[in-house]
Amino acid sequence: MEHKEVVLLLLLFLKSGQGEPLDDYVNTQGASLFSVTKKQLRAGSIEECAAKCEEEKEFTCRAFQYHSKEQQCVIMAENRKSSIIIRMRDVVLFEKKVYLSECKTGNGKNYRGTMSKTKNGITCQKWSSTSPHRPRFSPATHPSEGLEENYCRNPDNDAQGPWCYTTDPEHRYDYCDIPECEEACMHCSGENYDGKISKTMSGLECQAWDSQSPHAHGYIPSKFPNKNLKKNYCRNPDGEPRPWCFTTDPNKRWELCDIPRCTTPPPSSGPTYQCLKGTGENYRGNVAVTVSGHTCQRWSAQTPQTHNRTPENFPCKNLDENYCRNPDGEKAPWCYTTNSQVRWEYCKIPSCGSSPVSTEQLDPTAPPELTPVVQDCYHGDGQSYRGTSSTTTTGKKCQSWSSMTPHWHQKTPENYPDAGLTMNYCRNPDADKGPWCFTTDPSVRWEYCNLKKCSGTEGSVVAPPPVVQLPNVETPSEEDCMFGNGKGYRGKRATTVTGTPCQEWAAQEPHRHSIFTPQTNPRAGLEKNYCRNPDGDEGGPWCYTTNPRKHYDYCDVPQCASSSFDCGKPQVEPKKCPGRVVGGCVANAHSWPWQVSLRTRFGTHFCGGTLISPEWVLTAAHCLEKSPRPSSYKVILGAHQEVNLEPHVQEIEVSRLFLEPTRADIALLKLSSPAVITDKVIPACLPSPNYVVAGRTECFITGWGETQGTFGAGLLKEAQLPVIENKVCNRYEFLNGRVKSTELCAGHLAGGTDSCQGDSGGPLVCFEKDKYILQGVTSWGLGCARPNKPGVYVRVSRFVTWIEGVMRNN
């Protein structure tokens, strides 16, 4: 069984001024290599381990791994190109970039890739061989030139680039066709451009990707870890014809950059397919009809649709004829259509080797489900967990079990048919300590999931808990339990999960250690031999053990029970249906407990709203246009059915209305009496001021609005929608510049899912770490669930200061 890691606080080791050597490495948390040629050494830090790798003389060190708690360094001759990556707990794998790269910089003097054929297709002779050609350059005469195997190299600094002696007796040597690295130039559309150009075509300075000034945006580096959004360098994260950036000019949001094209052929993009695999970016079949039966327009044509997805702008995307393709990272192949009324549509491409996943058929007439009042949790070690959580303890999105990107692995549905490896849901296929998943972050191979163990009663229908008011900030109780990952735990447990006594933190027997001691971590509570979590390990409190053969282990410290209901944490797990309020699904009853039905004084539902505190509801300003009098409105809380209201529903009058002073489509309602917070009525959390939701974040809308003939009318429905970055949403083919910076877009561009009339004012919530945060108020759209016309929502974070001021002063 493979082992796994927990997130390491690398900042503990990356001291200022000492991190430069590590810039030459790619690091992956929670990963190890099957290595044959290796050395195991002791090192006090990651930098010390890197130095040992650089100093190694007996073999070429291409990678090393560092165990933080054990202070163990393993240097290795292999890397991911010659070995298999596995998961391992408490390990970070560092691989030298130069040995992973298959491109050259300049004349390729430092090229260390594995190309072993010349540009004329002749196999290279081994550098250590003397047949058929006696070499002038060999590993013995030039030991620092990387003359391994028969790989192309440039030991003599030849201006024409890497070369090799050939296995053809008639040709002593030949040059190799190594593509240029995308540092000074770009291949294709610059999706992999890695250079440092930071000015636009017109000479404007680029805004840093991690800055929200002068332009707020959703391309947040931590949310797009595979897009290399460094500093203010030009990049192409969204399928434009070439790299671009946001500018430092407040009057110019973004502009393309002038990156020259590389003169060498681009690297191979991998195998191509005649069927649909993944999102179809490598589909090269001949389907030329959309899902609605429209004929595709030729990519080189500009009639009837004018566009910039041309063969010239996307030279590597094989935009031949009018065949369906995916040149810009959409969710599936598509094309512009020859119907002037339909700009573009997705295509129906047969899947490679598997039938489409069937979706659950939902009964629109079914009564509200009697769902247990429980949080999503797991029993035992979680091998039986079959929930839909897909977020790790640090908030990272899980990689699909059937995907090999960004992490190649063997934990597939085919290899583990009984493990429930569906979509990207958290699972425990290998009997680990709890559910986990591979992450979509290339630098973090896997993490445990943001789930808690079920208590004795969770998982079965239980009586509703007592009614309580909203909590103040939680403080640890005297009970021996922990909050979160237990970094603040100061209890007196001193045995591991296996019952082994802990070694005292100040002791050096049986295990020597220097990083986690009372002297180095005086505020971490490292007293006696008590379980602690000084490094914020997401696995929870741990200790060095008194077993000489077991360096450290985790402790079994339970989570503290919350004494009240926290904002954004429903007591019923939402369904989170992946389907396309039009085209969504009926929600689990009371799984969105902040949902408000805004009604006329006669009881007619006409808008949605969101409970944000016991006395306050947030809604859209346009919902209040018919009357400025609070007495015209009332709110319904805790409802699942629109008409036949359940007995527990709370009906409260509105005492005051507050419209946003700059006329944004957002308003506050003060209730005549505070709502009673129960398991069915819980506020949503507000975001941080000016927080920007990253593009492609999956969020949820809910409401009773118009369903346009789809199922579930009269019951609360939900739909999952991706946020669309405003830059994309404002493209000509979508909303054509209509979306303001105080608004956000969300929706499926193919249509079929949207909020409609009657959903106005309702919530768009996004899951962040362990709770749902209100990021949007349903505002407007061009039609309802139309293709290419996503819904528009007021960006709540831009108005948090106003919201809090109104609530505080009234």
Swiss-Prot record:
Active site: H622 (charge relay system), D665 (charge relay system), S760 (charge relay system)
CDD domains: KR, PAN_AP_HGF, Tryp_SPc
Residue span of region Disordered: 126-145
Signal peptide: 1-19
Residue ranges of coiled coil: none
Activity regulation (record text): Converted into plasmin by plasminogen activators, both plasminogen and its activator being bound to fibrin. Activated with catalytic amounts of streptokinase.
Residues that, per the record, bind L-lysine: R136, D158, R172, D432, R445
Comment on protein domains: Kringle domains mediate interaction with CSPG4.
Oligomer status and interactors: Interacts with CSPG4 and AMOT. Interacts (via the Kringle domains) with HRG; the interaction tethers PLG to the cell surface and enhances its activation. Interacts (via Kringle 4 domain) with ADA; the interaction stimulates PLG activation when in complex with DPP4. Angiostatin: Interacts with ATP5F1A; the interaction inhibits most of the angiogenic effects of angiostatin.
Protein name according to UniProt: Plasminogen
Species the sequence originates in: Pongo abelii
